[in-house]
Amino acid sequence: MRTPIVFAATLLLLAGSTFAQEYVEFKSQQDRFSIVFPAQPKITETTYTSEFKSVLPARVYSVDQGQSHFKVTVVDYTNIQAIAAEKAKACPPGAEACSGNTGSGSSTGAGYWKPDIEGAVIHATWELMQRPNEKPLYLGWTNMNLVEGHMVNLVNEKNKSRTSAAIYMHENKLYIIEGTVPAGYPVPDFFQQSVGWLDANGRDIRYLTIYHNGFPKPEVRTQGGAQGGYR
């Protein structure tokens, strides 16, 4: 789901605002995404604590202009199994809720790594909705270039600022995309709606059917229009 007409119209509405001075189509080959920022983002290495308390490597791309804030947090779940298993070693004996179950038919795995990765989008969505003074106005399913995710709109009940966010899981990486603007500004849907996905060669891709993380990847169409298996 990518709406170029709505996106372009929103940019025109924002053209007179203080943060809409120079738009940058930013691409991260390292994290395989593209997005339109209002300026070159600052990149910060950090960590992210998952629902079941595994500490994962993360990277934050951010732009702050006045009271407007734009941010993409990318959390790498690639090594969640090993990280959770290491965490589980410190659990008290018999504390299954901490250590998980390593049996072949277990739904948890060591340190609950299985529900951690499967529920990453839901957990990140819940965390957004639990922020102090933030009231959810909308929560729904969405997709961007056929990668499925959640879309959330929030209003701050104190200062009336608006946040438009989207959360996706692609290639075992969690993407939390947030745009926040002051009261009276157009809702910044344009930011999360401008996200795209890159292949190993840095080309923009669009899946031909819905992409579900953890399932076999659908065929893709690259920027040049060629079709074929994802490489």
Predicted regions and their residues:
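Positively charged n-region of N-terminal signal peptides that target proteins for export
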Residues: 1-4
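N-terminal signal peptide c-region/cleavage motif recognized by signal peptidases
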Residues: 15-17
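Conserved polar/disulfide-associated segments of primarily extracytoplasmic proteins
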Residues: 49-166, 230-231
